[in-house]
């Protein structure tokens, strides 16, 4: 029985040579702000936009390391709406909008690592799961006074509620706010804001991968990490990409 070297990896069943995949990963990790499917198609000489689009989503999928460490220490947590023309109502979904929970770890006076997770609404159940997924129990978690965070103490966190006062003004959670601003700028600049909500999770994974490695001076190390993780994640077929067969609908587009 013969087993391909790509079996059980993100490259499984590929018809393209691995060296072309490696070129794609080198190109992706060497572009500071990311790449578009059109840019990848042009750079590699791929036959179709669809192939480039599928490859990029597979690589974004590989950017999440299995069993990755959760945040610890002091972490700010808040939610942000992406897209749509009208402001969303907290605790509820909104047509044409995606609600993302943002967790930012403090590193002195700077932002350390982050975690991003899309949720359907800002209910206590969804917010609790998002925090548990990305933050170690015992961590100091700072939030605003939204009731959806009221169960964090019971979940094993040291919950600190930051309230507006004359000293800090309205910027209650500055690190989270900075991350949200950079995320929106990245979606608008690199992807022209045209990211379907059904595909947003992959873009959040890429932004997290890039942000958490933004201080690395070695592009080669980023390339190595991506290759390493591409070999560690489960296979992903094009048909498995969330929303791959979804029809384009106006409310599925994230405008930031």
Region roles according to the model:
Residues 1-256:
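Residue-level recognition of single "structural anchor" positions
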């Amino acid at each position: 029985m013969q087993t391909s070297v790509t079996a059980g990896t993100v490259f499984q069943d590929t018809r393209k040579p691995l060296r072309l995949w490696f070129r794609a990963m080198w190109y992706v990790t060497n572009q500071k702000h990311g790449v578009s499917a059109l840019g990848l198609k042009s750079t590699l000489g791929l036959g179709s936009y669809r192939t480039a689009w599928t490859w990029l989503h597979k690589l974004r999928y590989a950017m999440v390391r299995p069993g990755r460490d959760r945040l610890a220490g002091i972490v700010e947590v808040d939610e942000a709406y992406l897209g749509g023309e009208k402001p969303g109502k907290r605790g509820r979904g909104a047509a044409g909008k995606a609600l993302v929970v943002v967790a930012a770890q403090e590193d002195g006076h700077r932002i350390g690592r982050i975690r991003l997770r899309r949720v359907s609404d800002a209910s206590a159940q969804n917010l609790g799961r998002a925090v548990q997924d990305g933050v170690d129990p015992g961590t100091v978690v700072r939030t605003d006074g939204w009731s959806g965070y009221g169960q964090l103490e019971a979940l094993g966190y040291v919950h600190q509620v930051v309230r507006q006062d004359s000293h800090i003004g309205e910027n209650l959670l500055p690190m989270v706010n900075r991350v949200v601003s950079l995320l929106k700028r990245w979606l608008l600049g690199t992807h022209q804001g045209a990211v379907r909500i059904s595909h947003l999770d992959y873009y959040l994974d890429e932004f997290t991968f890039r942000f958490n490695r933004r201080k690395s001076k070695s592009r080669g190390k980023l390339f190595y990490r991506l290759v390493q993780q591409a070999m560690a994640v489960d296979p992903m077929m094009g048909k498995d990409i969330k929303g791959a067969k979804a029809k384009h609908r106006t409310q599925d587009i994230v405008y930031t």
